[in-house]
């Protein structure tokens, strides 16, 4: 269906002494696709693992702000995201980091995993490791979409969305998001669901204002 852009602006008063520079906020709902259900048999290295008929990770989107003034902030020192291997899935299977951010890939299963990616934005291979071994860590120094796989269990698939902007948030399972402490100005806001489904709108953010922006389904 045709996307409708709904922007409701609520002007709020600034507290005394508060800076208006990064005092805008944006919230809304992304209409998400239905969850997927998978069943697979993996047989490698002399082992056979059958995945039960259960839902994968619930659908989610990453909502982020693009524009000239969104690339100034750097990742916070020590911030490390995690994408675990659990129940033969990447959990969560979608995360976002700012360029220069790090991600750990802990193994929480009772079997070997081997996390790797051949994506242009980041190529890596962490090798085989078990639950009781140190989790591999990767620094993502180039923006782009990084698709993550397990070399042993080929049904496993995850995505690391590496962004230049520090202004992003992953939605909850119902599609809700909220971005706070945003700069005022003219920006493009994108909702990334997968490489085939990226929705975007243009928004003018005002200092001290709260705006609502929804992303209906296609």
Question: Model segments located where?
Answer:
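Positively charged n-region of N-terminal signal peptides that target proteins for export
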Residues: 1-5
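Bacterial N-terminal signal peptides
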Residues: 6-15
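Extracytoplasmic copper-binding redox domains, predominantly the cupredoxin/blue-copper superfamily
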Residues: 20-218
């Amino acid at each position: 269906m045709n996307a409708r852009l709904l922007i409701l602006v609520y002007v709020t008063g600034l507290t005394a002494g508060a800076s208006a520079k990064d005092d805008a906020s944006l919230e809304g709902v992304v209409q998400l696709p239905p969850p997927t259900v998978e069943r697979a048999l993996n047989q490698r290295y002399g082992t056979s693992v059958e995945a039960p008929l259960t839902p994968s990770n619930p659908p989610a989107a990453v909502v982020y702000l693009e524009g000239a003034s969104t690339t100034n902030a750097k990742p916070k020192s020590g911030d490390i995201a995690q994408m675990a291997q659990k129940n033969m899935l990447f959990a969560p299977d979608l995360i976002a980091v700012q360029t220069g951010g790090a991600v750990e890939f802990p193994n929480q299963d009772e079997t070997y995993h081997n996390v790797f990616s051949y994506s242009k934005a980041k190529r890596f291979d962490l090798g085989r490791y078990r639950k009781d071994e140190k989790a591999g860590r990767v620094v993502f120094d180039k923006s782009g979409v990084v698709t993550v796989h397990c070399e042993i269990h080929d049904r496993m698939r995850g995505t690391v969305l590496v962004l230049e902007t520090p202004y992003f948030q992953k939605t909850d399972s119902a599609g809700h998001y909220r971005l706070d402490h945003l700069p005022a100005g003219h920006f493009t806001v994108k909702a990334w669901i997968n490489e085939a489904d990226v929705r975007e709108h243009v928004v003018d953010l005002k200092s001290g204002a709260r705006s609502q922006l929804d992303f209906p389904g296609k």
